[in-house]
């Protein structure tokens, strides 16, 4: 079985976002706007946390897959590419975690 990556999933999200199909769950989410996508992402994140707290490995894996999907949909809704997130991660990993945290802008 070929390895399925986040890039594969991002490409699927992109393709479904561009489709005119009413049967696409991805398209329906995006059509409802970024706020809806953010809310759905939050719901899935909470479900993932609950699965982790309950120590339910199978459920945690399933909910994590949902979180990753909804994260990519949310990013798409705001025009952010996975590669931009990867660049931010690469920049952060070039220094220690404490240095990186100290370098962040404060609100």
UniProtKB/Swiss-Prot annotation:
Biological process per Gene Ontology, one example term: L-histidine biosynthetic process
Transmembrane segments: none
Enzyme class: hydrolase
Location in or out of the cell: Cytoplasm
Major localisation: cytoplasm
Highest rank taxon of the organism: Bacteria
Keyword tags: Amino-acid biosynthesis, ATP-binding, Cytoplasm, Histidine biosynthesis, Hydrolase, Nucleotide-binding
Pathways per UniProt: Amino-acid biosynthesis; L-histidine biosynthesis; L-histidine from 5-phospho-alpha-D-ribose 1-diphosphate: step 2/9
Documented EC number(s): 3.6.1.31
Keyword Nuclease among UniProt keywords: no
Presence of keyword Cell membrane: no
InterPro entries registered for this protein in UniProt: HisE (IPR008179), PRib-ATP_PPHydrolase-like (IPR021130)
Pfam families cross-referenced by the UniProt entry: PRA-PH
Single GO term (MF): phosphoribosyl-ATP diphosphatase activity
Reactions listed under catalytic activity: 1-(5-phospho-beta-D-ribosyl)-ATP + H2O = 1-(5-phospho-beta-D-ribosyl)-5'-AMP + diphosphate + H(+)
Gene Ontology CC: cytoplasm
NCBIfam families: histidine_hisI, PRK00400.1-3, PRK00400.1-5
Family, similarity comment: Belongs to the PRA-PH family.
Protein name: Phosphoribosyl-ATP pyrophosphatase 1
